[in-house]
A protein has these predicted regions:
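Residues within mature, well-folded domains
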Residues: 18-162
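Positively charged n-region of N-terminal signal peptides that target proteins for export
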Residues: 1-4
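C-terminal motif of bacterial Sec signal peptides marking the signal peptidase cleavage site
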Residues: 13-16
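Sec-dependent N-terminal signal peptides
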Residues: 6-9
Length: 162
């Protein structure tokens, strides 16, 4: 009985992962087609006339995909946003929490540092598609970005490297 239960759990988990490895949605696909391929988005953000569908891979995940849907409900673009290039688009002193959500999606976690007079959002990512890294986006009390600081993601590195 225990083996049957474990087999059922394994098959369910495998079925849940099946969509992750299927073909990505294509530009022009409808919202219904995108959601049939990717499932329910983790968040939905209005962005002017467009809508952003966020597909975050969990708090320990290093990937978040954004599907940009046009006003006609058709896919304009689909991209992985936890990249060096996307972090580089954040404007210090200008971007705020709302704009960061639209650029990067939800953070892996939110922390507070005594040295930062505001919130810090942490994003796990593969820096240069190689290194396990953690990007801190630091906000002031008004929610405006004050700094971006990256370093190794110590939770993902082998203990002997620390």
């Amino acid at each position: 009985m225990k083996k049957l239960f474990l087999l059922t759990i394994f098959c369910g988990a495998l079925a849940g992962c099946a969509n992750m490895f299927g073909p990505p949605p294509a530009p022009g696909d409808s919202t219904a087609v995108v959601q049939s391929k990717l499932g329910r988005p983790t968040n939905v953000y209005p962005n002017g006339p467009d809508t952003l569908l966020e597909y975050a891979m969990g708090p320990l995940g290093q990937y978040t995909w954004m599907a940009r849907m046009g006003p006609d409900g058709r896919l304009i673009s689909y991209e992985q946003v936890l990249t060096d290039a996307k972090f580089g688009t954040i404007k210090i002193g200008r971007d705020n929490k709302d704009s960061v959500l639209r650029i990067l999606g939800r953070p892996s976690r939110q922390v507070r540092y005594y040295s930062v007079d505001g919130d810090v959002w942490q994003y796990r990512y593969k820096q240069s598609d190689v290194w396990n890294s953690l990007m801190d986006v630091q906000f002031d009390r008004n929610g405006v970005v004050q700094a971006l600081v990256n370093g190794p993601d110590e939770e993902r590195e082998p203990r002997w490297l620390r």
